[in-house]
A protein has these predicted regions:
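Short coil/turn connectors at secondary-structure junctions
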Residues: 1-3, 29-33, 62-65, 92-96, ...
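N-terminal phosphate-binding or glycine-rich loops at protein starts, especially the Walker A/P-loop
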Residues: 1-45
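Gly/Ser/Thr-rich loops at beta-strand to alpha-helix junctions
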Residues: 9-13, 100-107
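Short glycine-/acidic-enriched loop or helix-start segments at secondary-structure transitions
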Residues: 15-16, 46, 108-110, 132
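Short Gly/Thr/Asp-enriched flexible loops that form oxyanion-binding sites at enzyme active sites
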Residues: 17-22, 103-118
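Hydrophobic/aromatic ligand-binding patch that stacks against planar heteroaromatic rings
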Residues: 25, 59, 88, 111-112
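Short, acidic/small-residue loops that bind anionic groups at enzyme active sites
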Residues: 31-35, 113-137, 144
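Glycine-rich oxoanion-binding loops at beta->alpha junctions
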Residues: 44-99, 104-105, 123, 127, ...
Length: 146
């Protein structure tokens, strides 16, 4: 499979570690390929991405932030946004997305799945710890302890 990865919403600790884990597990165990979209959904709409490999993930654990950038926003901010997402998936041969984000990013991912059938896996991330169905989201403990 070829999978798009993006981090949406605000920055928080642990994003690079999650990206690294997704890429390593998928690449090593399932021979998947990964594309990291720069600055969340904006990167998808503008087709700005980098290839993510086990090699590019080396040294990521101690680095803060996210190597692919993050931003708030939605393809639904544009009349043709959902269709542009579908077109990018088709052009790049993407089978689905891993979306790492909070309520906004995960809601967008769910709506894209509903409207255009985009397969998505959501990774809950928020310093607010307000995502239904989770006990503690990564990013929260560091936010309240610092």
């Amino acid at each position: 499979m070829r999978i798009g990865v993006l981090t949406g919403g605000g920055d928080c600790p642990g994003l690079n570690a999650v990206i690294r884990a997704v890429v390593r597990k998928g690449s090593v165990d399932f021979d998947d390929e990964f594309v990291g979209f720069l600055d969340a959904w904006d990167g998808v709409l503008e087709k700005k991405f980098i290839e993510l490999t086990v090699g590019t993930m080396r040294g990521m654990l101690p680095r803060g932030g996210t190597i692919i950038g993050t931003r708030r926003g939605s393809p639904f901010d544009h009349a043709d946004g959902p269709q542009r997402v579908r077109n990018v998936c088709d052009e790049l041969g993407l089978d689905g997305f891993v979306v790492i984000g909070g309520n906004g990013s995960l809601s967008v991912a769910a709506e894209l799945h509903a409207q255009i059938g985009l397969p998505v896996v959501g990774v809950p991330k928020t310093i607010d710890n307000d995502i239904v169905g989770t006990d503690v989201c990564f990013g929260f403990n560091t936010a309240v302890q610092i």
